[in-house]
């Protein structure tokens, strides 16, 4: 996917603004489902070159009758010219990503993509739906306040509105922390650990970075 960009640049991060995260959850699930049906090995089941045309003609004659079989030469000619005339050099849609197992898709997608979500968007809960998302993944939803737009009549109520998702049991307090803080740190401080230096959240960022490093060492 995307020309294998996250395989070639594993530390590169991408953030999508004002699109929510529901579509990201769908893309993530679809990537895995498509890989299962169209990976480099399975795709051969769909390769026109592997079609037994003689057997297909026999089956059409046997079950379709003479009327249908009389059109078989025409159909076969169209099939030959249409199905095998423009095959790509590489049949594996995921070749650029060098996917060997489903888990590779998770590792090349989840840490690399982040999704700006407005505080009044209930579908951002999908990002944290570990019982639904493949591999129990939680995607990188980010708080996008949308301040100054019509849907934010009072800028002091943005976080309060986001907290309603916790009150309504859509997300946990841990997920809320990731949504409003943790995922932003992952995005902007992953390549520049000092990104938040000199800001009011510097000490909290340092604390989270230390906890993350300790957790990774323990694995």
Locations of the language-model features?
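Divalent metal-binding pocket/active-site signature
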Residues: 1-53
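Mid-to-C-terminal alpha-helical segments outside catalytic/metal-binding sites
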Residues: 3-4, 12, 22-23, 65-106, ...
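C-terminal structured domain segments across diverse proteins
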Residues: 30, 37, 41-42, 52-74, ...
């Amino acid at each position: 996917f995307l020309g294998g960009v996250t395989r070639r640049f594993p530390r590169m991060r991408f953030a999508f603004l004002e699109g929510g995260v529901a579509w990201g959850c769908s893309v993530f699930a679809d990537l895995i489902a498509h890989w299962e049906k169209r990976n480099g090995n399975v795709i051969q089941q769909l390769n026109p070159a592997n079609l037994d045309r003689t057997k297909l003609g026999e089956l059409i004659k046997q079950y379709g009758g003479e009327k249908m079989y009389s059109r078989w030469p025409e159909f076969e000619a169209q099939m030959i010219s249409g199905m095998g005339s423009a095959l790509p050099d590489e049949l594996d849609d995921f070749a650029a990503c060098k996917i060997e197992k489903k888990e590779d898709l998770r590792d090349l997608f989840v840490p690399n993509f982040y999704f700006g979500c407005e505080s009044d968007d209930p579908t951002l809960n999908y990002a944290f739906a570990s019982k639904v998302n493949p591999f129990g993944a939680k995607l990188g939803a980010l708080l996008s306040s949308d301040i100054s737009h019509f849907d934010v009549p009072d800028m002091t109520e943005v976080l309060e509105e986001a907290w309603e998702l916790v009150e309504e049991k859509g997300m946990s307090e841990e997920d809320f922390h990731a949504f409003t803080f943790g995922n932003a740190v992952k995005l902007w401080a992953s390549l520049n650990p000092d990104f938040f230096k000199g800001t009011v959240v510097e000490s909290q960022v340092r604390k989270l970075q230390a906890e993350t490093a300790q957790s990774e060492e323990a694995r």
